[in-house]
């Protein structure tokens, strides 16, 4: 029996699930017909509190797969916790994560192992996933995967545009060389991904503060990238996402909450742009916005706004208590900013270079933040004042009143000196 072997597997495939027994059965069925010897990989099903026949489905594969099962109480949508629980139970040096409903090709395990083999450094492998388009699932997909096994489905429609991995245009643009991407972490989607277990735990695994649908995988990708762990794409370790019911509006709402968590945990421009672009449309181009902010930074370099900041500070009423002031578009180019007594300054600018000198100051009353002001990590009404300078003119042409709206969210007073005629 596959489950009785003492041979250490080469790969652990972790599948989180919740009340989708039929879909899980289909995913496990494709893993049971891999070309790789069954003793060389194991499957770990991590149950997020199912009340259907999920446990019975897992038991039905005990004579066909090396399979483990872990259950956690249903305390709401906790897929990050479920994946971590599955990873803790895994015994292989490599982890793969598949979503319930992903139908793996027969050489999936073999291809994952091949992608991680050789003298190349340990890396994250993004496996392709055909058919995934939560915005607009294609009507032919259901009948296709019902009628044919995965490899035959790919043979029949593998070149059809509607069947492609949604990320294909992004991958093609860099000839599948993710080292040419500024933000490869944006495409770290755990419907099909693999990485060394040591690297997974080195960065802390999934952040279990992320509950609800969406974003927890991209945030992990962000941390992996920040730790210098390279990412690559494998077109060979593919799967097909079987169509299933989705609560799209609820998912989008949940995703935005998690994007907000992302910004609070990693307060810098790129997570901020991820929040802003996702808020406009779930699969917008963050890279396009990054390049636009680079251009605006180039145009504004050398622009001094110290007089505008002084005008804004003059609007503060006298106070015996410390007052917090944030500046959107602080610039400064390293010139000194000396806040008045009892004022704590938070200097925000989308050009990280102009903040460098301020960061070297030994001044507890001044802190620098590589943020534009589209979405900040602070709670509502955290500041007494936000000053928006003319360095924001370029971004405001594209983003309109978004900066003013965010300023009013976090502060009781907002001043834009360049619009006052002072």
From Swiss-Prot:
InterPro entries with a match to the protein in the record: Galactosyl_T_C, Glyco_trans_2-like, Glycosyltransf_2, Nucleotide-diphossugar_trans
Keyword Hydrolase listed: no
Domain of life (superkingdom): Bacteria
Entry note: cofactor: Also able to use Mg(2+), Co(2+) and Ca(2+).
Family to which this protein belongs: Belongs to the glycosyltransferase 2 family.
Cited function: Involved in the biosynthesis of the antifungal agent validamycin A. Catalyzes the final attachment of glucose from UDP-alpha-D-glucose to validoxylamine A to yield validamycin A. UDP-glucose is the most efficient glycosyl donor, whereas GDP-glucose and ADP-glucose are much less efficient. ValG also utilizes UDP-galactose as substrate to produce the new validamycin analog, 4''-epi-validamycin A.
Protein name, as recorded: Validoxylamine A glucosyltransferase
Name of the gene encoding the protein in the UniProt record: valG
């Amino acid at each position: 029996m596959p489950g009785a072997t003492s041979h250490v597997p080469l790969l652990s495939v972790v599948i989180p699930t919740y009340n989708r027994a039929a879909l899980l059965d289909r995913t496990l069925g494709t893993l049971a017909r891999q070309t790789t010897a069954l003793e060389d990989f194991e499957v770990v099903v991590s149950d997020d509190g199912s009340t259907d026949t999920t446990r019975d489905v897992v038991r039905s594969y005990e004579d066909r797969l090396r399979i483990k099962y872990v259950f956690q109480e249903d305390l709401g949508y906790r897929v990050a916790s479920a994946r971590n629980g599955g990873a803790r139970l895994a015994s292989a040096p490599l982890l793969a994560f598949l979503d319930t409903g992903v139908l793996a090709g027969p050489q999936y395990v073999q291809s994952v192992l091949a992608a991680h083999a050789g003298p190349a450094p340990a890396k994250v492998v993004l496996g392709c996933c055909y058919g995934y388009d939560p915005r607009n699932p294609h009507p032919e997909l259901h009948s296709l995967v019902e009628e044919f096994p995965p490899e035959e489905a790919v043979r029949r429609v593998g070149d059809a545009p509607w069947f492609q991995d949604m990320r294909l245009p992004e991958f093609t643009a860099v000839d599948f060389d993710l080292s040419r991407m500024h933000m490869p972490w944006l495409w770290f989607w755990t419907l099909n991904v693999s990485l060394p277990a040591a690297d997974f735990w080195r960065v802390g695994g999934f952040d279990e503060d992320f509950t609800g649908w969406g974003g927890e995988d991209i945030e992990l990708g962000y941390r992996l990238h920040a730790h210098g762990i390279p990412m690559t794409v494998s077109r060979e370790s593919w799967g097909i996402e079987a169509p299933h019911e989705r609560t799209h509006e609820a998912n989008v709402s949940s995703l935005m909450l998690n994007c907000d968590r992302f910004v609070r945990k990693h307060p810098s421009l790129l997570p901020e742009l991820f929040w802003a672009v996702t808020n406009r449309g779930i699969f917008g181009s963050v890279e396009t916005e990054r390049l636009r902010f680079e251009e605006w930074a180039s145009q504004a370099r050398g622009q001094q706004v110290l007089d505008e900041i002084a005008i804004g500070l003059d609007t503060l009423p006298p106070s015996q208590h410390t007052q917090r002031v944030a500046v959107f578009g602080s610039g400064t180019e390293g010139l000194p900013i000396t806040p008045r007594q009892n004022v704590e300054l938070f200097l925000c600018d989308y050009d990280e270079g102009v903040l460098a000198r301020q960061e070297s100051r030994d001044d507890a009353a001044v802190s620098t933040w590589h943020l534009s002001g589209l979405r900040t990590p602070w709670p509502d009404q955290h500041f007494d004042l936000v000053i928006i300078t003319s360095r924001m003119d370029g971004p405001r042409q594209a983003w309109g009143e978004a900066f003013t709206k965010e300023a009013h969210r976090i502060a009781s007073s907002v001043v834009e000196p360049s619009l006052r005629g002072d």
